[in-house]
Amino acid sequence: MEKISRVWFDSRRVYIETDASKVYSRPLEAFPVLLEATEEDRLDYKIGRFGDDIRWPSLDEDIHITSFMEETAEPDYANDIAMIFSRFPQLNVSEVARSIGINKSLLSKYIYGIKKPSEKRKQEIVSSLHKLGRELIAI
């Protein structure tokens, strides 16, 4: 297996170069912790001893080389969940995720269109937001 030799970022993507001189990249939306991190925190990484992973100790984030090599979705900002959060930017992703019992990172991937929620999960998200709306009306 190839080994990671270099890591860098631009405004929307994270890149790796391997010892085989191949370059791979993924959108930062695939890694919400890195997307929200400062440039300084993004640059504070260590390539693992075997060259197959990257660790950001200050962010408690790890990414394996296979995350760059898999056929995975690019961001799709035109999805239903993204449109809801775009229309209501005051929504707190962490709190909405907590209210439906999922990880913030997973909800972020739904918002960015990196992962697609099942119809059941989409309904759970919408129902949670409807509940919030009813609570706001009751004030």
Located regions from the model:
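Motif-centric detector for short Cys/His coordination patterns
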Residues: M1-I139
